[in-house]
């Protein structure tokens, strides 16, 4: 009796075991872990790969267009010359002296036009040759060979009109040794000879940027200022090319401007974001002083970026690591100069 009572009073122990995970629970857990460990962002290629693909695409398109354009020009010049000679001979045989006189005038004008066109094509070819030289220099730097660097640099010096009396060039020649490989030869040429041209071109960019910023900040005629700044930007690109020994014609100047703009448009995303952020900060700081000063800073920074890209395209050698000029070098000078100009104008 007592045993049955004890069995009824004390119930059997119930063990609450943890439920074993089922297949559906495993799937839900896997989905939660997948959602936490992934950010669902698309895979992005490196900026260098994108820029390289774009440069190859632009180069191929330019090569196809230039071949067709050259063929048409040669055919047109040949047909013009043939028709002119035939017209002069026919006029002389028939005794039509008036037609002969006009044909001589037309032939003279055609000769002048063909000569000018040939000169433009030569300058355009020189601009393309500079791009080829930079690619060859990159190949020599990557190959790290021996025996080709000195001849290549001497060729660059000759094309850039650098004479033996040049102090940096003479020092570079005296510094060369038989143990130097091509990479070291090109780096020495960059440091001793090309650095002088880089310094002159940077001074030009700083000068034109500050002048453009001051013109926009101080003048009330916005349209006239922008036209003048556009002309000054063309002048800046031309003078930078002269510093590096490349003479530009009309079409080569247009070609260089297109290359500069394309280079700016295809710049790496990190560089663009950094520069844009600093530009907006600079314009915000300048805007606290004056709206015109902020506009001047914006135009000056645009001119500076244009000039720096022109330097990159005109250099016969690619930039060494941590050597490429930054827009921050111009930004501070612009702010200081425009702020000083604004304060002096208010005092007057």
UniProtKB/Swiss-Prot annotation:
Cell membrane keyword on record: yes
One Gene Ontology term, aspect cellular component: plasma membrane
Residue ranges of the TM segments: 71-91, 97-117, 211-231
Main location (coarse class): membrane
Localization annotation: Cell inner membrane
Topological category with respect to the lipid bilayer: Multi-pass membrane protein
Keywords: Cell inner membrane, Cell membrane, Membrane, Transmembrane, Transmembrane helix
Top-level lineage group: Bacteria
Pfam families: DUF697
Family membership: Belongs to the UPF0283 family.
Protein name as it appears in the record: UPF0283 membrane protein PBPRA2435
Organism: Photobacterium profundum (strain SS9)
């Amino acid at each position: 009796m007592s045993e049955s009572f004890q069995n009824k009073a004390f119930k059997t122990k119930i063990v609450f075991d943890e439920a074993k995970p089922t297949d559906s629970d495993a799937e839900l857990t896997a989905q939660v872990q997948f959602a936490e460990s992934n950010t669902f962002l698309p895979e992005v290629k490196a900026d260098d790969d994108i820029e390289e693909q774009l440069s190859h695409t632009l180069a191929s398109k330019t090569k196809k267009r230039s071949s067709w354009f050259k063929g048409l020009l040669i055919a047109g010049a040949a047909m013009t010359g043939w028709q002119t000679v035939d017209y002069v001979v026919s006029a002389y045989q028939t005794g039509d002296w008036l037609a002969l006189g006009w044909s001589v005038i037309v032939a003279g004008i055609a000769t002048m036009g063909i000569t000018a066109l040939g000169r433009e094509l030569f300058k355009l070819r020189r601009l393309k040759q500079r791009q080829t030289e930079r690619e060859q220099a990159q190949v020599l730097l990557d190959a790290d060979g021996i025996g080709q660097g000195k001849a290549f640099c001497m060729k660059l010096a000759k094309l850039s009109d650098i004479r033996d009396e040049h102090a940096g060039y003479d020092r570079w020649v005296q510094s060369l040794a038989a143990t130097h490989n091509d990479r070291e030869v090109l780096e020495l040429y960059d440091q001793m000879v090309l650095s002088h041209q880089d310094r002159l071109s940077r001074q030009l960019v700083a000068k034109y940027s500050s002048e453009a910023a001051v013109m926009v900040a101080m003048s009330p005629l916005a349209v006239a200022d922008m036209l003048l700044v556009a002309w000054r930007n063309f002048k800046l690109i031309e003078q930078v090319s002269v510093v590096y020994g490349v003479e530009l014609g009309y079409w080569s100047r247009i070609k260089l401007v297109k290359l500069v703009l394309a280079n700016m448009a295809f710049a790496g995303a990190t560089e663009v974001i950094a520069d844009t952020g600093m530009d907006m900060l600079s314009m915000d700081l300048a805007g606290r002083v004056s709206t015109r000063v902020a506009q001047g800073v914006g135009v000056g920074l645009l001119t500076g970026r244009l000039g720096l890209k022109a330097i990159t395209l005109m250099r016969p050698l690619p930039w060494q690591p941590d050597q490429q000029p930054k827009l921050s070098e111009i930004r501070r000078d612009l702010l200081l100069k425009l702020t000083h100009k604004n304060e002096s104008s208010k005092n007057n």
